[in-house]
Amino acid sequence: MASPGGAALQRHAAVSVLRAAAAACEFSAGKAIHAQMVRAAHFDVILHNHLISFYAKCGRLGLARQVFDAMPSRNPVSGNLLMSGYASSGRHADALALLRAADFSLNEYVLSTAVSATAHVRSYDMGRQCHGHAVKSGLADHPYVCNAVLHMYCQCGHVEDAVKVFENVSGFNAFAFNSMINGFLDKGKFDSSISIVRSMVGEVEQWDHVSYVAVLGHCASTKELVLGSQVHAQALKRRLELNVYVGSALVDMYGKCDCACDAHSAFEVLPEKNVVSWTAVMTAYTQNELFEEALQLFLDLEMEGVRPNEFTYAVALNSCAGLAALKNGNALSASAMKTGHWGALSVCNALINMYSKSGSIHDARRVFLSMPCRDVVSWNSIIIGYAHHGLAREAMCVFHDMLVAEESPSYVTFVGLLSACAQLGLVDEGLYYLNIMMKEMGIKPGKEHYTCMVGLLCRAGRLDEAEQFILSNYIRADVVAWKSLLGSCQVHKNYGLGHRVAEQILQLKPSDVGTYVMLSNMYAKANRWDGVVKVRKLMRERGVRKEPGVSWIQVGSEVHVFTSEDKNHQWINQITRKLKELIDQIKVVGYVPNFGVVLHDVEDEQKEEHLMYHSEKIALAFGLIHSPDGATIRIMKNLRICDDCHVAIKLISLVTARRIIVRDTVRFHCIEDGVCSCDDYW
C-alpha cells in the first residue's frame, strides 16, 4: 500500500502529465494515465476534473462525459469543465442539457458558460431561467455572469432586457458597453446606440480596441462622420489606429460616410494589412462607385500574397456589377471556384447580382439554381434581376417558389415583385400584394412600393388614377413617382396631363434636366415648336444644362467609356465611318431622325449629327467594329436611353443580325431582330 505522501506525489505527477497531454493533444499519454488511475483506484474529484479537461481539449467529449457520469461526487468545476468542452465544440444544446440535469452547485463560471450556450442557440427562455438563478444565488452582478447575460439578451433579440441589466452595471465595463452597442446596431436601433455611446464618452480612456470597433460600427451605420472623426482622433492619441481591427473599422466608417480618400488613408497607415482590412478598403471604394479602383485593389491584394476570402470575392464581384464588366466577373468566378469559395452564400449572391447587372440573366439563373442554400438576398437578387430584364412572369414564378420554400419575403422582395407586375400591367395583382399580402407579413409599404404602383397604373393606361394615387399617398413630393407618370404621358400621348405633371416636377426640382427633355419631346411630337423654344429658353434662364450622356462597353478585358459627341477617341475616324454606314442602312428600313430630342437650337442637319453622336450609338459602333459577327453587344448608359437611340438601335439589330443589350437607368433593353424586350415602354 502506498503511503499518504506517496499517493499525493502520484496524484501530483498524474495531474502534471494530464495537463501536458491536454496542451499537446497527446491522447495516448493521457489515456495511459487514466488506465493507471483505474488500476490504482485513484478517483478523487481533482483527478476526475483533470481527466474531463483532458478529454474535452482532445475533442473526445464522449469519454469526458463517461468520466463525469462515473464520478461518485462532483464540484462546480466538474460541470463547468464539461460544459465548456461542449460549448467550445459548438455543442451548445448538450451544454444546456447538462445544466438542466445538474446535480452540482452552480458558481459564476458554470453560470456564465451556461448563459453563453443559451446565446449561441438563441434560447431566450433558457437564458432567462439562468439569469433568474444568477439573481437568486447573488451572482448576477459578477462581471462574467453579467456580461454573458447582456450578450445573451442581445443575441436573442431582447435588447430591452439587456438595457435593464446594463443600467445596473456599476462603473465602466468595456464588455457590457460593447455588447450593448452591437446589440442595438444588430436591431437597427441607432438612436439607442448613440445614447449609450454618449453616456460612455467620459470613459474613453478605458475603452479597449473592441470598444473602438463597436463605436466606429455605429458611426458607419448612421453615417455619423463628425463623431467617427472624433473617435479616430482618440484612437490616434492611443496609437490604436495601427491595430488591424480598429484600422479596418476606420476604413469601413469612412467608406460608409462617402469619404473614400479618408478610408484609403486609414488603410495605408496600417503596418500589417490582413484580408479584413483589404476587403474593408475595397468595400469603401465600391460603396462610393469607384469600381475600377476596387478591382485594382483586388489585384494588389493578390500581388501582396494575401488570400482573398468569400467576402473579398463578393465585393470584387459587386464592383464588376457596377461596371457591367462581364469578363472580369467570369474571371473572378473561376478564381473563386479554384480557391474553394464559389459555393459560399455571399459569393453566389454577388454572382447573381453581377450577372443580372451585366445583362446575362441566364447565367444569374444558373448560379441561383446551383446554390446549395439560399437566403432572402438570393431570392431578392434573382426576382429583381428578372424584373429589370423584362421577364416579369419569371419573377412572379420565383416569388411563388420563395413562398413554397418558406423563405420570408422582405421589403426589397416586394419592390421587385411590384416592378414585375408593372411590366405586365397587372393592377389587381399589384394592389393585392401592396394592400393585403404586405400587411399580412407585417411589411409597411414605402415610397419604392408606391412608386411601383404608379408605374403599374401607368402601364395599364390608367393615368388619371395614377395621378390621384400620387396625390392621395405620402409620395406626392416624390419626384421619381411624378417622372414615372410623365414618361407614361409621353408614351400614351396625353400631353395635357404631361404638361401639368412636368410643372409639378419642376416646382419640386427646378433643375431636373430629364423633365425639360421629356417636356420638349412632348411639344415636338405635338408639333408645338413654340413650346420647344419655350423649354429651351426656360433652361437657359435657369442655368440648367443637360447632363452629358455616358455609355461604356467592355471589349476584351478593357472597359471603354464614351460621352455624347465624343470626337476625341483614338478610334473616332473608324467609329464615324461605321456610324454613317449604319445610319444609311437603317434609313432604308424606315429610320427617321427624331429631332424632338435635340435641345440645341440649330438647323436640322446639325441636329442629325448631334443624334448620331449620342454616347450609346458611339459605343455600339465601337462594339460592332471590335467583335466577331453574331456576338452579343452589351452597352451600359448613365441616363435613360432617348427615343431616337431606342428606335435606331432596334433597326441596327435588324440590319446587323445582332443581339444588343442596353442597360439604362430604368431597365435592361434586350433588343433582337428589331424588337425590344421593353415593348417600347420605359
Can you describe what each PLM-predicted range is?
Residues 1-682:
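Terminal (and in a subset, N-terminal) low-complexity or junction segments at the ends
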